[in-house]
Amino acid sequence: MPIQVLPPQLANQIAAGEVVERPASVVKELVENSLDAGATRIDIDIERGGAKLIRIRDNGCGIKKDELALALARHATSKIASLDDLEAIISLGFRGEALASISSVSRLTLTSRTSEQQEAWQAYAEGRDMDVTVKPAAHPVGTTLEVLDLFYNTPARRKFMRTEKTEFNHIDEIIRRIALARFDVTINLSHNGKVMRQYRAVAEGGQKERRLGAICGTAFLEQALAIEWQHGDLAMRGWVADPKTMNATLAEIQYCYVNGRMMRDRLINHAIRQACEDKLGADQQPAFVLYLEIDPHQVDVNVHPAKHEVRFHQSRLVHDFIYQGVLSVLQQQAEPSLPLTEDAISPRPIPENRVAAGRNQFAEPAVARQPEAPRYSSGASAPRPTGANYPHAPVYQKQQGALYSKLLDTPAVERKENVAPSAPALDGHSQSFGRVLTIIAPDMALLERDSHIALLALPVAERWLKQVQLTPGTNAACAQPLLIPVRLKVSAEEVAVLNRAKAVLVEMGIEFVVEAHHVTIRAVPLPLRQQNLQNLIPELIGYLAQQTSFDAANTAQWMARHLASDHNLWSMAQAITVLAEVERLYPQLVKAPPGGLLQPVDLHSAMKALKDE
């Protein structure tokens, strides 16, 4: 058979195989188009589970007459126009395939009117070449899409459709997910002429609880713990059910959204499951409704044809962010109410954060700051609610209310004299390497220290920092779960070594499970997170096999010397961060620098030589 260009209808039908899986897929694509058009009301009519009719009507901005034919063409969209747009998608649709694909496997009619037009226009495609016909019609501002006889021309696909009830249940589930994503939109769903669901638009107040309860049930509503978590450009809000009260019904409630897009993401599910695993049974699943907001440049949604999956550029960061957010809420829920004493409130330690000029701006009197607003926005996305809008938030509402009422009856505490709250903060800065002037590539920092100039070897400072982080003690890094556990094959002798050294390794933050011929690394301390564990762990086992006794300090020293550097080419910010951590965790190193770390530079000799010339 010779190579030939496929007819447009056949090409669209092939694309429809990826985009249009069943009637629920059609509903999802069309409703997302309505949301992108700024609709505040969407009416969905279904007949015979979507096999006979799917009608979506909205009050969005509409489509101009001269763009109707393009709307039904393949790879035609108003959502993106360049690669820059593709790399920072904020709309739900962007491929330009949905309408063309749906039109190729059904009898689709598109009727639309914009606010600038006096009349509406209707378009439909037919024939082998999918020629579009446009004619006048009566219609208010907005768009209506009718999909008749789905898969009428692809009998094989139609044969795989399930019963009317099953197909409608899939549609109902899609609408539930969309209704949870957009509280500000009214959505009505009818089946065979009977109204099945009515989700009224709600404001930013407590009415959101009503929609949440209508979709997820009162059982979830009563057990829901509110989450409000933010770090830089990452923000997470929503609800997670108390794991102590989990049952089979609640376990079916697992809804997550990324920038308003409903998602089934294994990374997100794994992070939540890991945060709840101590309180869940082996066969139980967590229940949650979570909204993750991230810089669109940091997430790729152009992964799955139906846009069910995304790819995060910093997946480990996102995983740990979600894990810590969920875990913190669960831990605070388990904590008893804070006891009130008459002791004076101790000053809160101020974290170290050195700047390039050598001044610690965070050691100065702190001023309350408002959270930064996201640096990206979408006109179609719902405004972010505050924590007060979430139902049943015992951590943020019940405890604070109880404490506040107690404070009203608490006698005034006399202010103690001769209290120097700034002393603890100043003590942390008594030892300093000085001011970082510049970086001499690839790994030297030029410092101004006590009116003298010195060179500092950044890899050596980094090695000492990792050593102190690996050494058990008050400053030791705790075990951090791995996103994907590392499984290595080991011999019987190596298994024996690991079992003998297990206490020391666990103390250092390395958690593992030993099997017959394998070891699975489940958690490691912070310095090991970016390392190649496939190579490091066998070397560590070899080192331990040569030891007659196991000492955490010696093991930490060996590991620090064998870890790869996190930086090939150092920057000012990286150097300042590492030096600040060394000053905080190991001030003795600043007071008495070891050999190979710091080298004074004699500028006087150089200046004298220049003057002599």
From Swiss-Prot:
<comment type="similarity">
    <text>Belongs to the DNA mismatch repair MutL/HexB family.</text>
</comment>
<dbReference type="GO" id="GO:0140664">
    <property type="term" value="F:ATP-dependent DNA damage sensor activity"/>
</dbReference>
<dbReference type="InterPro" id="IPR042120">
    <property type="entry name" value="MutL_C_dimsub"/>
</dbReference>
<dbReference type="InterPro" id="IPR014721">
    <property type="entry name" value="Ribsml_uS5_D2-typ_fold_subgr"/>
</dbReference>
<dbReference type="InterPro" id="IPR042121">
    <property type="entry name" value="MutL_C_regsub"/>
</dbReference>
<protein>
    <recommendedName>
        <fullName>DNA mismatch repair protein MutL</fullName>
    </recommendedName>
</protein>
<dbReference type="InterPro" id="IPR020568">
    <property type="entry name" value="Ribosomal_Su5_D2-typ_SF"/>
</dbReference>
<dbReference type="GO" id="GO:0016887">
    <property type="term" value="F:ATP hydrolysis activity"/>
</dbReference>
<dbReference type="GO" id="GO:0032300">
    <property type="term" value="C:mismatch repair complex"/>
</dbReference>
<dbReference type="Pfam" id="PF08676">
    <property type="entry name" value="MutL_C"/>
</dbReference>
<dbReference type="GO" id="GO:0006298">
    <property type="term" value="P:mismatch repair"/>
</dbReference>
<feature type="region of interest" description="Disordered">
    <location>
        <begin position="364"/>
        <end position="393"/>
    </location>
</feature>
<dbReference type="InterPro" id="IPR038973">
    <property type="entry name" value="MutL/Mlh/Pms-like"/>
</dbReference>
<dbReference type="InterPro" id="IPR020667">
    <property type="entry name" value="DNA_mismatch_repair_MutL"/>
</dbReference>
<dbReference type="InterPro" id="IPR036890">
    <property type="entry name" value="HATPase_C_sf"/>
</dbReference>
<keyword id="KW-0227">DNA damage</keyword>
<keyword id="KW-0234">DNA repair</keyword>
<dbReference type="InterPro" id="IPR014790">
    <property type="entry name" value="MutL_C"/>
</dbReference>
<dbReference type="InterPro" id="IPR013507">
    <property type="entry name" value="DNA_mismatch_S5_2-like"/>
</dbReference>
<comment type="function">
    <text>This protein is involved in the repair of mismatches in DNA. It is required for dam-dependent methyl-directed DNA mismatch repair. May act as a 'molecular matchmaker', a protein that promotes the formation of a stable complex between two or more DNA-binding proteins in an ATP-dependent manner without itself being part of a final effector complex.</text>
</comment>
<dbReference type="InterPro" id="IPR037198">
    <property type="entry name" value="MutL_C_sf"/>
</dbReference>
<dbReference type="Pfam" id="PF13589">
    <property type="entry name" value="HATPase_c_3"/>
</dbReference>
<dbReference type="InterPro" id="IPR014762">
    <property type="entry name" value="DNA_mismatch_repair_CS"/>
</dbReference>
<dbReference type="GO" id="GO:0005524">
    <property type="term" value="F:ATP binding"/>
</dbReference>
<dbReference type="GO" id="GO:0030983">
    <property type="term" value="F:mismatched DNA binding"/>
</dbReference>
<dbReference type="Pfam" id="PF01119">
    <property type="entry name" value="DNA_mis_repair"/>
</dbReference>
<dbReference type="InterPro" id="IPR002099">
    <property type="entry name" value="MutL/Mlh/PMS"/>
</dbReference>
